[in-house]
Amino acid sequence: MPNKRIFYASHAVSVDGTVVHGAQSVGINTNFNLEQVFQLGRLAIYDNIATDPDVEITINKILDGRPTIWKLATTGGSLVQRANDQSTIVLAVDDETQDFIAAPHTAAITMTGCYISSLNYTFPVDGNLTEEIVFVGSHKAVGGTVGTPNADPLDRVLRRQNVAISECTLPAMVITRKLSQISISADLGREKMFSLGQLAPFHRFVNFPLEITVSFDVISDGENQNILAGPTFNETNVECAGINILKEPIVIKLCDSDGDIAYTFNLGSGCSLQSVSYSGGDTGGGNVTETYTYITYNDLTITG
């Protein structure tokens, strides 16, 4: 009997032959990047040219002790070492009446030569700790196979108690504060390289320097009056006077239920405070939140 719908149990995704365990969502967006050509003497369009078709794949997963999508898709240590790695992404769909996905599939799509375009990690006080990776590529074809996801996580799904605060290296502004969320993000800013004789780009390079952002949401209690709005500064006309924004190390560690470190996010020692925001506390009953956003460049190592 043909499928009437696709829901979470009837589709799955793999990266380089390994099924993504704990995947929460997957989306595919195809853009043919049409360019219009017109001609003198006629109002109607002359031609619609597909200049360089793109496929974008977004995968979101919970962190559960198993390898990150970042690790499945790339090899090496630092961000620079992993920048040119390409992956094969397969999305498979099965019968909606099955308990789990398994080959042979009802349908499948394979996307080869995919590069990581952006990454985002979110560690909230409410909900699960998550990873979201966006891939971009130029090849999409029918077919492919995805393995059956495991029934259980490797340990437990990580939540707020699994942020190992005592093991983290945090900036001075937030080290003693009550944190409600940590977010790490980077847009790799891929640019295409073309050559005569072929439609698809032969390379998508990372446009260094690459900015990495980490933000800390803090529950404001009003006791830290001197840092409520971040470092203070006064407009001055004194020669040679300026604002000294220090560079600080940031390392975020997540632990499993046994207390062992499952994931480490090392942003190096060159993180600088970029902005501070103060919001909330309105008449709707919400609390005031301070957000401290730090930036660094070209330095991000993820293990786990």
Over which residues does each language-model region extend?
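Signature of extracytoplasmic/envelope-associated structural regions
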Residues: 1-304
